[in-house]
Amino acid sequence: MKTKIYFPLLLVPLLICIMLPAQAQVSIAPTMLFVQDNTNMSEIYVTNTSSVAQEINISLRFGFPASNEEGTISMRYEDEEKRAIYSVDEQVRVFPRRLVLQPGQSQTLRFQVMPMANRPDGMYWARAVIASRAVSPDVDDLMLAQGEVGARVGVVFEQDIPLFYRKGNATTGLIVHQVFTDIDQERMVLRVHATRDGNSPFLGTIVAEMFDSSGAMVQNTARSAFFYFEEHRRIEIPVEDMESGRYRVDLHFDTQRRDISARDMVQAPRQTHSIEVEI
């Protein structure tokens, strides 16, 4: 019997979306794959960080992070309409697809995207699922030798990372529809309602700058952000030590990320959206 523990690695700060009491048995680097159509290849490094041998299996599926109106993010996998348009899960070949790593051992996994000449320019994607479980071949023999009958329980860890395939002229941008504000004594929560523009997801950073009535900046903060389709994203600004009054908040949307190389980003000009708030 196998029990699965699932770690979706989303494009959020620190790339951690779920905290579980168990720890992953293998480490993955990098945690995002970018494939260009002039090479069709990319790779990751998998390392067995546990004290026992690990069986590794790699699979592909389509999915993307989506949000509700409150900005809560979850993975969405059951969208066949978008899968038919944007997915490359059936075009990806992995070498090797199955392997066993001894404790401390590392292995390069190469991902090849087969050419898609009949599809328009833009960014396509899939999720690479790296599943691992401990190899313990002697357990069943030991139970039989001792005359024991029981169910062998194996824990399978699944780590889910994005794979992006860039074909031809990829473009992106944002259409900001509205910014909602929720303010209490300690913080101001901004919820950005926006739709990605162009033929590629918007991967980048939201920078929030807050100015008082004299034009002096009194707060600034930033968070990574991604818009695959129409989304809501949250960003929080501390306000507990600020005086009452009116302020201006400038929200800048940049296609820059510290954890993503500039050559992998689909670039767009900085976009700025300003709102007036009262504390």
Predicted segments with their positions:
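Short edge beta-strand/loop segments characteristic of extracellular beta-sandwich folds
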Residues: E43-T47, V189-D197, P238
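Bacterial N-terminal signal peptides
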Residues: P8-I18
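Terminal connector regions
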Residues: M114-L163, G245-I279
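Short acidic, flexible loop segments centered on an aromatic residue
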Residues: N57-Y86, T195-S214
